[in-house]
């Protein structure tokens, strides 16, 4: 039985990047606890597959195609999410991309725009649209999925680190902007998790060793280990929490 404090029963939550990795873990866990989940990502087929699995297990899920980097299409995304169950109670800005560039000089404008578009521009627009929709039904909660790269940047991920640092600033600013309409905005600063996006180095013993060396727990995270933070921030357990960044990284000094 779900603790009433962390109850998300019947809450409508839109999760971007929801069809795989951390997003899929979030969608599955939220649905298991009674939330009505909108699984959104660029590949509709992948969203449909996860939504079908959630539904078969007794949960409620709806697939939705969503290109977070496409500013003009995002209004339609929020409208579509609201249309499914008549409201929107939660948004998880989880979609992201973190390609490694050889150097800042060799980072093309196209790559720069893609990284900033998915990691900052899209969440900015979605936050504004979702907060407006939430305000119409009494408020809600927005969770921005950031990265340790935003506070511990490395040379090979300069643009990604800068975009995620911008996302942290967006979290603080919008928490202030939307507090008066009952919308809370918080962030999760994630360490490295074992997902398809990190398979390239998690599967390489030498690279993996270098990644976990500064981590207190000496390992990468499992996708299900993000669930507790998300449940806290989307539920009434966090009604006095806004503008905060919660670090989930296995402990880094």
Locations of regions flagged by a protein language model:
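Active-site helix of classical SDR
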Residues: 127, 163, 171
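The beta1-alpha1 cofactor-binding region of Rossmann-like NAD(H)/NADP(H)-dependent oxidoreductases
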Residues: 44, 65-77, 109
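Substrate-binding pocket helix/loop in short-chain dehydrogenase/reductase
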Residues: 102-104, 108-116, 207, 211
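Conserved glycine-rich cofactor-binding loop
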Residues: 19-20
């Amino acid at each position: 039985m779900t603790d009433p404090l962390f109850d998300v029963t019947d809450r409508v939550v839109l999760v971007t990047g929801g069809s795989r990795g951390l997003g899929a873990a979030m969608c599955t866990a939220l649905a298991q606890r009674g939330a009505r989940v909108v699984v959104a990502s660029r590949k509709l087929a992948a969203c449909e597959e996860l939504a079908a699995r959630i539904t078969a297990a007794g949960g409620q899920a709806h697939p939705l195609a969503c290109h977070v980097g496409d500013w003009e299409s995002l209004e339609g995304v929020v409208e579509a999410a609201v249309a499914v169950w008549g409201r929107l109670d939660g948004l998880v800005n989880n979609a992201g991309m973190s390609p490694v560039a050889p150097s800042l000089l060799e980072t093309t404008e196209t790559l720069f725009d893609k990284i900033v578009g998915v990691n900052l521009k899209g969440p900015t627009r979605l936050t504004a649209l979702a907060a407006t929709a939430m305000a119409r039904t009494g408020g809600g909660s927005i969770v921005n999925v950031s990265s340790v790269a935003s506070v511990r940047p490395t040379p090979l991920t300069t643009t990604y680190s800068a975009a995620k640092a911008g996302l942290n600033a967006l979290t603080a600013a919008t928490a202030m902007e939307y507090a008066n309409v009952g919308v809370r905005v918080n962030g999760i600063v994630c360490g490295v998790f074992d997902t398809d996006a990190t398979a390239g180095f998690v599967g390489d013993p030498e690279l993996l060793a270098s990644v976990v060396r500064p981590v207190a727990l000496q390992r990468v995270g499992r996708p299900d280990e993000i669930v507790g933070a998300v449940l806290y921030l989307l539920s009434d357990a966090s009604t006095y929490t806004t503008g905060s960044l919660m670090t989930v990284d296995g402990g880094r000094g």
